Amino acid sequence: MSERIPIEILEGYRESFNKQEGRKYPCSNQTVVCGIFTDSRNKAIDFMEDKDIIDIRVMHNEIVWRLRNGEKWIWTNWNESHRGYRFYKVAVDKDVDRKLFENMILVYTSFYCCSFEII
């Protein structure tokens, strides 16, 4: 990760997003999921450790968890295109890259996200 966002700014976004009602269902053809934004596969796995997981799919550059409550959490290489996703809940690495945050996380969480965690 290159230029990082100061933790105070991330905390401000967390406060703002956690006040939103969020939108669990899309208004078009997008898929609404939950995303884990970190370069560390192990950090993503640790974050999901205490969740009520019913299914895990591990592929080369992606892990998908399905939870008993119906949520679908994804960890992947976020530097690739993910245009169809909108994020209802996110877990963001405290060392997240500024460019990734501004060009991916903010764009795909606006109006949908109601839970923003810093990991």
PLM region spans:
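Short, flexible loop motifs at catalytic/binding sites
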Residues: 1-119
